[in-house]
């Protein structure tokens, strides 16, 4: 094992040494580039573009382009890239992950590969975790890019489609992973080419890459429409479940995240619901609602998993502690929580389009990432995304002291010890940042500190509005800050405080901006700089920022991120974790022997222990959870890869239709496929001609591709299978030609385009639902000694082929029957975005009930109305 790590770090050192040679080349150009005037420096961009047009590669121009970017940064931003930052920039350009410690200037590092790759004109996407960071970085670094003659776009929630299109057409585009992903899905639901906003996915740099590509990898992006399902059952279950007794009527398995009824619970539930058999086929819906309500009451906790804000249940991100507005739990769980909390139940939704971040980001030609902590997840980055991790050396040595964990028997004993530590350090003036894993824990700690009279700031999902401001001042003298998890990532904690944050706050009070009054802003910054420098000296004397972790996270990476908030850029600092045996990680994954050990040692509740066995147990528990989570993500990907291949086929075909690419040929191919399939159905190969159902074939043809024909079965006898196909195809193509003459080629193309797009969208939507149901039940195949993934692939392939056949049938039927004489009324499906949904301008879906949804369709297709014309009526 030691050799493995030795080799790992040797490999890393070799990579860094290799890049050091290019750094020397860049440094050799510095003096020459510094002598250029602003105009000459700006002219370098056009010069580089010309070199690329003449056949040079990005690697050929890298040294000079980096030198130009560094010089422009000195002039525009007042910041010069360190040598280690040049190494980081090269790693990002190579399409790898640069692990850089907190405070090492990741935002500035990104300017180097962003500038270089933007010269190609194909676009660069810089992806951050929230709108605040995207806006901040696009404005801050945008000054540099604009100085060098490049355009900068910003994608944030709520901007109009035309503004999105402009932002994507810029050389460099900033935005969040959610916005980029949803724009991709929306583009693939567009009905007109001018509605498209994204262009080719060329190169992306993902900030906090571990958060986006690992922590959020299991969360699919979903655009959905409202489904027509009643909500009264959720309210019914919300009244019944509290009458069931935990551990008697049902058991809660937190590790497996499941709740199961006992035999007693089943009997009691049947009695309360007034039904004979809960598991009867007729009661499947009731059973499902009861299970979701049990999960809502037994597993989901208010102020940990979600909060209730303005009569709405809002999910809390388990990794960052931020509120996830617009995102909803699926499969009715969110509605069950709404019923439990007594708020209005929003209707369930039907998936219209979906993709995981794993598959979205794998579509880029080149992807790179930055984070402070990636090495622990290198295997996953390499296996799933093909990304290597390179650890970038720090500019100054890290001198932070990481103290040993303190382990307590109970949670309250642990919190009492944390409060004592905070009080003592606060009295000396040392700033303290306390990390908690939930809102409830942060508020408990806050109340304990209030009792002791310690002034402090709380940063959690309930108080996220001033996140950057609070976290930026966490390094001030006597500052005490409580933050859930990794809230505030992306904002540096400067010892003594951040003068620019102070200055911006004062400017806001005066009602002026930095852009409108740059001279006044600079004066205010200088005033606060003197104050902050004075405080910085006092804080340094007290040991710098101290980090307290109140619980070990299930991922070592998250713990390392918390520690990394202290000791930036060679500053002093320290960190320590306080652990209780009642903590979730220890309770669910730690060894039960530890509690017994503490009892045998006769440990008092308030006395901590430092023990190698316990430290090892914590590390083992974390590794087990990390391994389990990786397996889950890999498992999700195994299934999603099947869906992804199908998605790529559908979206590629859809894009061709949208842009009108060879549409008439596409329709002719579709007609051919439908005609040949109909002959294969009614006149199968290997069956004697006398047994062919020619009457059935003609009836089928009339309902599909030859309306009102006057062919008699006798006319088709003795033709043979190929002769039949040729005859029917010739007649159908003749009808199609007449159709084009009647309507005009341009009108028919537009009809074909709209019909194809709508049918593809509707069938794909149904297919997504069917695939979800297949995936839900496929795990049971394992009991029959079959590999569920292989079975899923096989059945998904069959379902996909059936969907394609259904699309072809319906397209042909509509084209031969559609009537454009009367003005058509268009009804737009209400679209609800599961995350960051805009509610303005939405209309409910209208339904006509003249024909029963389960009645045979009057068009004669033989299908039910709901599966045929009822969808498009």
UniProtKB/Swiss-Prot annotation:
EC numbers on record: 7.4.2.8
Annotated SUPFAM superfamilies: Helical scaffold and wing domains of SecA, P-loop containing nucleoside triphosphate hydrolases, Pre-protein crosslinking domain of SecA
PROSITE patterns for this protein: SECA (PS01312), SECA_MOTOR_DEAD (PS51196)
Region entry Disordered, spans: 835-873
SMART domains, A to Z: SecA_DEAD, SecA_PP_bind
GO biological process: intracellular protein transmembrane transport; protein import; protein targeting; protein transport by the Sec complex
Biased composition (Basic and acidic residues): 835-856
UniProt keyword DNA-binding, yes or no: no
Ranges of Basic residues composition bias in the record: 863-873
GO function terms (MF aspect): ATP binding; metal ion binding; protein-exporting ATPase activity
The protein's required cofactors: Zn(2+)
UniProt: Zn(2+) binding residues: 857, 859, 868-869
Main localization (coarse): membrane
Binding site for ATP: 85, 103-107, 492
Gene3D superfamilies per record: Helical scaffold and wing domains of SecA, P-loop containing nucleotide triphosphate hydrolases, SecA, preprotein cross-linking domain
Pfam family, one: SecA_DEAD
Compartmental location: Cell membrane; Cytoplasm
Membrane topology: Peripheral membrane protein
Record-linked NCBIfam families: PRK12904.1, secA
Annotated function: Part of the Sec protein translocase complex. Interacts with the SecYEG preprotein conducting channel. Has a central role in coupling the hydrolysis of ATP to the transfer of proteins into and across the cell membrane, serving as an ATP-driven molecular motor driving the stepwise translocation of polypeptide chains across the membrane.
PANTHER family linked to this entry: CHLOROPLAST PROTEIN-TRANSPORTING ATPASE, SECA INNER MEMBRANE COMPONENT OF SEC PROTEIN SECRETION SYSTEM
Quaternary state and interactors: Monomer and homodimer. Part of the essential Sec protein translocation apparatus which comprises SecA, SecYEG and auxiliary proteins SecDF. Other proteins may also be involved.
Protein name: Protein translocase subunit SecA
């Amino acid at each position: 094992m030691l050799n493995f790590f030795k080799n790992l770090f040797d490999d890393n050192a070799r990579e860094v040494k290799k890049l050091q040679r290019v750094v020397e080349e860049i440094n050799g150009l510095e003096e020459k580039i510094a002598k250029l005037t602003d105009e000459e420096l700006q002219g370098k961009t056009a010069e580089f573009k010309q070199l690329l047009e003449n056949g040079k590669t990005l690697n050929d121009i890298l040294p000079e382009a980096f030198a130009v970017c560094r010089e422009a940064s000195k002039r525009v931003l007042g910041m010069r890239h360190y040598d280690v930052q040049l190494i980081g920039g090269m790693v990002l350009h190579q399409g790898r992950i640069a692990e850089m410690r907190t405070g090492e200037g990741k935002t500035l590092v990104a300017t180097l590969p962003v500038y270089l790759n933007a010269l190609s004109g194909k676009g660069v996407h810089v992806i951050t975790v929230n709108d605040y960071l995207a806006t901040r970085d696009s404005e801050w670094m945008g000054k540099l890019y604009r100085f060098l003659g490049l355009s900068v776009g910003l994608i944030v929630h709520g901007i109009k489609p035309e503004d999105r299109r402009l932002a994507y057409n810029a050389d460099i585009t900033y935005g969040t992973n959610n916005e980029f992903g949803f724009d991709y899905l929306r583009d693939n639901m567009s009905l007109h080419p001018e509605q498209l906003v994204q262009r080719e996915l060329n190169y992306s740099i993902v900030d906090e890459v571990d958060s986006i590509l690992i922590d959020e990898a299991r969360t699919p992006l979903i655009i959905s429409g409202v489904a027509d399902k009643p909500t009264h059952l959720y309210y019914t279950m919300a009244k019944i479940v509290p009458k069931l007794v935990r551990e008697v009527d049902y058991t809660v398995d937190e590790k497996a995240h499941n709740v199961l009824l006992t035999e007693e619970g089943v009997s009691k539930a049947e009695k309360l619901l007034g039904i004979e058999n809960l598991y009867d086929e007729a009661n499947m819906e009731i059973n499902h609602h009861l299970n979701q309500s049990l999960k809502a009451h037994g597993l989901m906790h208010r102020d940990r998993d979600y909060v209730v804000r303005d009569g709405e249940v809002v999910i809390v991100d388990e990794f960052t502690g931020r509120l996830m507005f617009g995102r909803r739990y699926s499969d009715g769980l969110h509605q069950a929580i709404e019923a439990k909390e007594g708020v209005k139940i929003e209707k369930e939704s039907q998936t219209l389009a979906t993709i995981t971040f794993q598959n979205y980001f794998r579509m880029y030609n080149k992807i790179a990432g930055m984070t402070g902590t990636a090495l622990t997840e290198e295997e996953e980055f390499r296996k799933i995304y093909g990304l290597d991790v390179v650890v970038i050396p720090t500019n100054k040595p890290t001198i932070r002291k990481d103290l040993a964990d303190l382990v307590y028997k109970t949670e309250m004993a642990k919190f009492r010890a944390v409060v004592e530590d905070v009080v003592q350090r606060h009295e000396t003036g040392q700033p303290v940042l306390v990390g908690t894993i939930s809102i409830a824990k942060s508020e408990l700690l806050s109340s304990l500190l209030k009792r002791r009279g310690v002034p402090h700031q709380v940063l959690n999902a309930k108080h996220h509005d001033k996140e950057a401001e609070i976290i930026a001042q966490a390094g001030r003298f006597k500052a005490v800050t409580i933050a859930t998890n990794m809230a505030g990532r992306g904002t540096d904690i400067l010892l003594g405080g951040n003068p620019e944050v102070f200055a911006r706050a004062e400017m806001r009070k005066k009602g002026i901006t930095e852009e409108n009054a740059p001279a006044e802003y600079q004066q205010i910054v200088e005033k606060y700089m003197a104050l902050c420098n004075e405080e910085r000296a006092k804080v340094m004397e007290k040991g710098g920022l101290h980090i307290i972790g109140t619980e070990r996270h299930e991922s070592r990476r998250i713990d390392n991120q918390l520690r990394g908030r202290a000791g930036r850029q060679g500053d002093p600092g320290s960190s320590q974790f306080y652990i209780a045996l009642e903590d979730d990680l220890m309770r669910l994954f730690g060894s039960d022997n530890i509690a017994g050990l503490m009892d045998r040692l006769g440990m008092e509740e308030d006395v901590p222990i430092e023990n190698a066995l316990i430290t090892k147990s914590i590390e083992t528990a974390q590794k087990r959870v990390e391994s389990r989570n990786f397996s889950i993500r890999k498992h999700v990907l195994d299934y999603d890869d099947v869906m992804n291949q199908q998605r790529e086929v559908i979206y590629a075909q859809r894009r061709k239709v949208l842009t009108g690419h060879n549409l008439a040929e596409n329709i002719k191919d579709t007609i051919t496929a439908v005609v040949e399939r109909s002959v294969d159905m009614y006149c199968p190969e290997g069956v004697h001609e006398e047994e062919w159902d020619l009457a059935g074939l003609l009836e089928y043809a009339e309902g599909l591709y030859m309306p009102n024909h006057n062919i008699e079965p006798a006319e088709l006898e003795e033709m043979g299978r190929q002769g039949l196909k040729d005859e029917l195809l010739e007649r159908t193509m003749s009808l199609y030609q007449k159709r084009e003459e009647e309507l005009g080629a341009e009108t028919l193309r537009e009809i074909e385009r709209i019909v194809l797009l709508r049918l593809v969208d509707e069938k794909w939507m149904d297919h997504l639902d069917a695939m979800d149901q297949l995936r839900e039940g496929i795990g049971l195949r394992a009991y029959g000694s079959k590999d569920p993934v292989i079975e899923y692939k096989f059945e998904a392939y069959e379902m996909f082929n059936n969907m394609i056949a259904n699309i072809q049938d319906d397209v042909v039927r509509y084209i031969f029957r559609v009537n454009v004489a009367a003005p058509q009324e268009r009804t737009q499906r209400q679209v609800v975005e599961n995350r960051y949904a805009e509610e303005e301008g939405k209309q409910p879906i209208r339904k006509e009930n003249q024909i029963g949804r389960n009645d045979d369709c009057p068009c004669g297709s033989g299908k039910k109305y709901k599966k045929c014309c009822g969808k498009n009526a």
